[in-house]
């Protein structure tokens, strides 16, 4: 350094300029902040003084960041040396001086705001304040290679990612699963073909948060899930069950009662009052005995039921004249009711007899009186070949003949003395208190029952007796049904023999004496028995006239009640003959045996088919009932 005269002006330091209020280069300037008091009041505490200073600094930094006055010296020589430049993919520098200065001011303001919030919880940061982007992160390794059978990723993510979202929400952290196996096979990676971040690392969970406390909390929950998946079996893992339940709820297949009740095969059947109701007839459940429609299957019939059915069957066969009357019927069935005194029955359609149950229970009418008119059944009295004749066996029906001739070609309606009497001459079944029929009996009830609604003592009955004519049978009268066919199996051996076998085994009885008619008054169905048996061999009077004479000769016989529905025939009117029948023979000459009766009246006028009442025999007197054969003509005179 030169001294003295050799000294230059540069060697002497420059004098400092005097400071003045108008100088613009002063380093210290007064700071004026709007809204902040410039005078500090006395008596403040240390916390209040610190809060005032911190708030003043926050406002100053906010003003600088807002106005862009970052305090960078304009002279480059006064600036501090810059670090190495950092460029982005576009070639722009990232760490410029302005960027570094702004980042420094933001960090300083962030620290001041954090301190101010701790001093004054009611402090509100500036509007342009944003927390810094720096975050705390941590990694949690997932032992997938050690336990390949456990799905750790599924336990962490959960159904639709809800488990991971819940952890992030609770811990205020961000969790990402990265590494090998974090991405499912087949998913497309980055478009540029580069690897995803952390893909070359082992499988792990990256936890990122603003604070270290949030990161630690999230890491602890992740480790608990991994530990539970390793130590607890899958069927006992509560987290796994909860995830499956939530997945079912999201899919709409959740049943809320699965865990509260047992399975159908494990729970007992609920008791119902209907299931406990048992029928006493059929043994079924669900209904009572009064509503049961079936009998108990397989129950054997009692002895009383069998005896009652046998008795009803024997009674029916006795009414048909095919079996003896059981001895107990008269005492158990109450007062006997004759068919003539029974109640009227409405007309039934053709070929439709009543059911056997009605015949067996009522026992009021024989079946040939209850059956309707039928053209398919022949009449015994209208053709030859009856029982015992040339027609066949004792129970075979002969073929109908076109003319009203006997079985041997004799006179019309002449009885064969060698064979059994015609059906209208056969005796009726004996009364219920007189035992069975005599052997060889084959016929139906006597003609007194065929009178139907005509009483014995009525005028119509006497009219027919006086004129030598048989009264017409009532409506609904039909001959007895034929016996069973030969192909029908016989009844079981335990029951009684069939009626036709009983009749074949019994020998013919001797004819009853004629004196029995005079000793006591016979019953109505016994009046024809004596007359028909005694007159069978004489041949002086025709059989149908013998019955009428015998009925007229017994005035003491009780009169039978007629059917109230039948209209009696007026005197002097003869029933019309059926179509196809031969005309009646002329009356016998005087002095013959047939002149004891009045000659028959002329036939009535023809019927009007258009009048239904006339056709039914209810409007014109003297017309026979519907579907009944007419009375036979009187016999020719005998020389």
UniProtKB/Swiss-Prot annotation:
UniProt motif Nuclear localization signal: location: 15-19
GO MF term list: identical protein binding; mRNA binding; RNA binding; transcription corepressor activity; zinc ion binding
Domain KH: 141-222
Coiled-coil portions: none
Recorded family membership: Belongs to the BBP/SF1 family.
Outcome of substituting residue 20 to T: Decreases interaction with U2AF2
InterPro entries: BBP-like, KH_1_KHDC4/BBP-like, KH_dom, KH_dom_type_1_sf, SF1-HH, SF1-HH_sf, Znf_CCHC
Modification(s) after translation: Phosphorylation on Ser-20 interferes with U2AF2 binding and spliceosome assembly.
SMART domains linked to this entry: KH, ZnF_C2HC
Protein known as: Splicing factor 1
Record PTM Phosphoserine, positions in chain: 14, 20, 80, 82, 89
Keywords for this protein: Acetylation, Metal-binding, Methylation, mRNA processing, mRNA splicing, Nucleus, Phosphoprotein, Repressor, RNA-binding, Spliceosome, Transcription, Transcription regulation, Zinc, Zinc-finger
Role of this protein: Necessary for the ATP-dependent first step of spliceosome assembly. Binds to the intron branch point sequence (BPS) 5'-UACUAAC-3' of the pre-mRNA. May act as transcription repressor.
Modified residues (N-acetylalanine): 2
Extent of Pro residues compositional bias: 418-447, 470-499, 567-591, 598-608, 626-639
Source species of the chain: Homo sapiens (Human)
């Amino acid at each position: 350094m030169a001294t003295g005269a050799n000294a230059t002006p540069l060697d002497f330091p420059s004098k400092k300029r005097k400071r003045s209020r108008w100088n613009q280069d002063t380093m210290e300037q007064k700071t004026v902040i709007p809204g902040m008091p410039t005078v500090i009041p006395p008596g403040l505490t240390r916390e209040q003084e610190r809060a005032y200073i911190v708030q003043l600094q926050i406002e100053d930094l906010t003003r600088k960041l807002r106005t862009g006055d970052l305090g960078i010296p304009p002279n480059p020589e006064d600036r501090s040396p810059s670090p190495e430049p950092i460029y982005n993919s576009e070639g722009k520098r990232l760490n410029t001086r302005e960027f570094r200065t702004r980042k420094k001011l933001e960090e300083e303001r962030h620290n001041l705001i954090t301190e101010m919030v701790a001093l004054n919880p009611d402090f509100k940061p500036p509007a342009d304040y944003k927390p810094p982007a720096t975050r705390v992160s941590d990694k949690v390794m997932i032992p997938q290679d050690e336990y390949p059978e456990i799905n750790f990723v599924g336990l962490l993510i959960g159904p639709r990612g809800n488990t991971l979202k819940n952890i992030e929400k609770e811990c205020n952290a961000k969790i990402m699963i990265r590494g090998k196996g974090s991405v499912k096979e087949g998913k497309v990676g980055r478009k540029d073909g580069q690897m995803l971040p952390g893909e070359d690392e082992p499988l792990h969970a990256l936890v990122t948060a603003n604070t270290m406390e949030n990161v630690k909390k999230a890491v602890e929950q992740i480790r608990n899930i991994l530990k539970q998946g390793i130590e607890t079996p899958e069927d006992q893992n509560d987290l796994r069950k909860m995830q499956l339940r939530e997945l079912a709820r999201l899919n709409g297949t959740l049943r809320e009662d699965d865990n509260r009740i047992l399975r159908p095969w494990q729970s007992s059947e609920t008791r119902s009052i209907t299931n406990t109701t048992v029928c006493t007839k059929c043994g079924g459940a669900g209904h009572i005995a009064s509503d049961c429609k079936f009998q108990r299957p397989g129950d054997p019939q009692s002895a009383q039921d069998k005896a009652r059915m046998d008795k009803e069957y024997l009674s029916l066969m006795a009414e048909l004249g095919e079996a003896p009357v059981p001895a107990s019927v008269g005492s158990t069935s109450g007062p006997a009711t004759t068919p003539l005194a029974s109640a009227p029955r409405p007309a039934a359609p053709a070929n439709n007899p009543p059911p056997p149950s009605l015949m067996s229970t009522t026992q009021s009418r024989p079946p040939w009186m209850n059956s309707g008119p039928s053209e398919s059944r022949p009449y015994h009295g209208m053709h030859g070949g009856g029982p015992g004749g040339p027609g066949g066996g004792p129970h075979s029906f002969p073929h109908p003949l076109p003319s009203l001739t006997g079985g041997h070609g004799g006179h019309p309606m002449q009885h064969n003395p060698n064979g059994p009497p015609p059906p209208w001459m056969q005796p009726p079944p004996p009364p219920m208190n007189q035992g069975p029929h005599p052997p060889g009996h084959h016929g139906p009830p006597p003609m007194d029952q065929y009178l139907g609604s005509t009483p014995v003592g009525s005028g119509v009955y006497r009219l027919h007796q006086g004129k030598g004519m048989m009264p017409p049978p009532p409506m609904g009268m039909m001959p007895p049904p034929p016996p069973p066919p030969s192909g029908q199996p016989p009844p079981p051996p335990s029951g009684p023999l069939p009626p036709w076998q009983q009749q074949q085994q019994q020998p013919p009885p001797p004819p009853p004496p004629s004196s029995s008619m005079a000793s006591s008054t016979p019953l109505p169905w016994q009046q024809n028995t004596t007359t028909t048996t005694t007159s069978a061999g004489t041949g002086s009077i025709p059989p149908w006239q013998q019955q009428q004479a015998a009925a007229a000769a017994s005035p003491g016989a009780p009169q039978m009640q007629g059917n109230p529905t039948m209209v009696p025939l007026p005197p002097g009117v003869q029933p019309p003959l059926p179509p196809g029948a031969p005309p009646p023979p002329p009356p016998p000459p005087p002095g013959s045996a047939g002149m004891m009766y009045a000659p028959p009246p002329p036939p009535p006028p023809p019927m009007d088919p258009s009048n239904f009442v006339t056709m039914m025999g209810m409007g014109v007197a003297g017309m026979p009932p519907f579907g009944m054969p007419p009375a036979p003509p009187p016999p020719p005179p005998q020389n």
